[in-house]
C-alpha cells in the first residue's frame, strides 16, 4: 500500500503530460508566415490567463476584417512590458502576426507597435541574446 500511492501519483502526472503539452502547442499557427497590419484598430484587449487576447479591426480593399490574436499569459506579458491598459479600444496600432494555418482571421500576435512608437512583444520577453524567453 505504501508503494501504491506514490506509483498512482506518478502515473497520474505522466498521463496528464500529453494534455499539458497539447495545450501549449503552437501548431495551429503558421510561424513561417508573417502578416503585418499597419493600421489596425483595437476593438478589445482581454487581459486574462491563460492567454491574453487582442481583437483588432484591419482595413482591407473589401472593407474591415476582424482578427483575434492570441498572446502569452499575464506573467509573460508583464515581463515584456505590457500593462492591463497598454492598449484600449480605438487605439491605432501596428501588429505583426503569425496567422492560423486554417485561414481563419486569427493568429498569434508577435510584435505590437503602439501609437507612441513603443514596441511590445505579444509572445513574452526576449533574452539578452535575442532568443525568446521560455
Predicted regions and their residues:
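Conserved hydrophobic positions within beta-strands
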Residues: 39-42
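Short boundary/loop segments of OB/S1/cold-shock single-stranded nucleic-acid-binding domains
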Residues: 21-35
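Short, basic/aromatic beta-hairpin or loop at an interaction surface
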Residues: 62-74
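Bacterial N-terminal signal peptides that target proteins for export
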Residues: 1-8
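Short aromatic-glycine-enriched beta-strand elements
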Residues: 48-58
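Bacterial N-terminal signal peptides
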Residues: 8-17
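OB-fold/S1-family single-stranded nucleic acid-binding modules
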Residues: 100-123
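Short nucleic-acid-contacting surface segments enriched for D/E, G, S/T with interspersed K/R
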Residues: 79-94
Amino acid at each position: 500500500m505504501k508503494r501504491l500511492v506514490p506509483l498512482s501519483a506518478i502515473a497520474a502526472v505522466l498521463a496528464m503530460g500529453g494534455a499539458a503539452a497539447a495545450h501549449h502547442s503552437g501548431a495551429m499557427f503558421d510561424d513561417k508566415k508573417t502578416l503585418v497590419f499597419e493600421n489596425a484598430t483595437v476593438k478589445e484587449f482581454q487581459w486574462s490567463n491563460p492567454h491574453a487576447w487582442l481583437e483588432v479591426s484591419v482595413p482591407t480593399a473589401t472593407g474591415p476584417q476582424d482578427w483575434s490574436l492570441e498572446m502569452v499569459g499575464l506573467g509573460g506579458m508583464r515581463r515584456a512590458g505590457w500593462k492591463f491598459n497598454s492598449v484600449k479600444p480605438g487605439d491605432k496600432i501596428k501588429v505583426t502576426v503569425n496567422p492560423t494555418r486554417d485561414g481563419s482571421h486569427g493568429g498569434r500576435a508577435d510584435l505590437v507597435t503602439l501609437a507612441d512608437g513603443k514596441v511590445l512583444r505579444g509572445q513574452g520577453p526576449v533574452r539578452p541574446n535575442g532568443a525568446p524567453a521560455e
